[in-house]
């Protein structure tokens, strides 16, 4: 597989693995020649932007980040921040983007272009040692994405010199996105991609696909029939379309070893 088709998911960087381990994993990935990372301000229990910017101080890295992640303060989120406590400064930083009202993102005002501008400027400051490549809206409610809004969102991203993106789009928004906005990058679960592949393959949108490892694990548990046929067909689509990329969550030495095998031969993905 071409390394340029691999993006590293960092949802666990800062939470499941600590700061030191995150730095070690990133060093190994950069040695492999992979420098494109997918994140959001609340990934890694609120530490992800902080960790990636530390990496960016000494390396040229590309970042895809997101606005609107559906996360609010609860006991679990609070515990994870205590668990990964580094110092008071970073602990305070981890609460920077947390929301106390989980329903606020359902309001149209939350997705106002001015709100996006404020968020982007804040993200840009937090990631000032990195290059932001794509600015995603994270799972926006389906009633937000009408033609006029997407036009304004595209124009806004153009002023920031970043690619506009929609992460985890609603099924009802897909036709509008692929028929009228080929400039907007889409990030979606593998199941959604496969379900809509006939439409998507006819479009010119760039697509990033996630939940790859989760599907492999679930398929094995459920003893799904024709697994190899599905995976070979899927991987053939990826290898023959450079506009499609895989978002892979890598967070350990073991997963890095597996990633090396995938780069050597894409079919090794099925054997992970």
Model-derived regions, located:
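Short N-terminal helix-initiation segments at or just after the protein's N-terminus
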Residues: 5-11, 78-80, 103-105, 150-156, ...
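Non-cysteine beta-strand/loop elements that form the S-adenosyl-L-methionine
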Residues: 62-67, 89-94, 206-215
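N-terminal binding-site loop/beta-alpha segment at the start of enzyme catalytic domains
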Residues: 1-67, 71-82
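Alpha-helical membrane-targeting segments
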Residues: 71-114
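A short alpha-helix capping/helix-coil boundary motif
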Residues: 2-7, 102-103, 131-134, 179-181
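Active-site mouth loops of central-metabolism enzymes
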Residues: 9-20, 101-118, 223-228
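A broad, low-specificity signal for short, low-complexity segments enriched in glycine/proline
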Residues: 25-26, 95-100, 149-151, 173-176
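Beta/alpha (TIM)-barrel catalytic core signal, keyed to glycine-rich beta->alpha loops juxtaposed to Asp/Glu
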Residues: 41-45, 117-272
């Amino acid at each position: 597989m071409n390394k340029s088709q691999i993006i590293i998911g960092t949802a666990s960087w800062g939470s499941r693995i600590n700061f030191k381990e995150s730095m070690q994993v990133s060093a190994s990935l950069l040695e492999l020649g992979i420098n494109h990372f997918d994140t959001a301000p609340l990934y890694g229990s609120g530490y992800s932007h902080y960790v990636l910017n530390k990496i960016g101080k000494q390396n040229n890295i590309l970042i895809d980040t997101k606005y609107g992640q559906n996360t609010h303060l609860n006991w679990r989120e609070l515990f994870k921040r205590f668990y990964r406590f580094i110092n008071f400064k970073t602990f305070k930083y981890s609460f920077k983007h947390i929301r106390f009202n989980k329903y606020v993102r359902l309001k149209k005002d939350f997705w106002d272009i001015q709100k996006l501008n404020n968020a982007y400027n804040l993200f840009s400051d937090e990631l000032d040692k990195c290059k932001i490549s794509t600015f995603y809206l994270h799972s926006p409610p389906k009633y937000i994405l009408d033609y006029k809004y997407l036009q304004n969102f595209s124009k806004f991203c153009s002023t920031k010199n970043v690619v506009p993106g929609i992460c985890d789009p609603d099924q009802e928004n897909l036709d509008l996105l692929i028929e009228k906005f080929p400039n907007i990058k889409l990030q979606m679960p593998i199941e959604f991609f496969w379900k809509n592949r006939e439409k998507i393959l006819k479009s010119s949108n760039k697509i990033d696909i996630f939940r790859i490892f989760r599907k492999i694990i679930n398929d094995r548990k459920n003893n799904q029939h024709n697994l190899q046929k599905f995976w070979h067909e899927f991987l053939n689509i990826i290898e023959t379309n450079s506009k499609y990329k895989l978002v892979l969550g890598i967070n350990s030495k073991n997963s890095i070893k597996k990633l090396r095998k995938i780069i050597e031969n894409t079919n090794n993905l099925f054997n992970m």
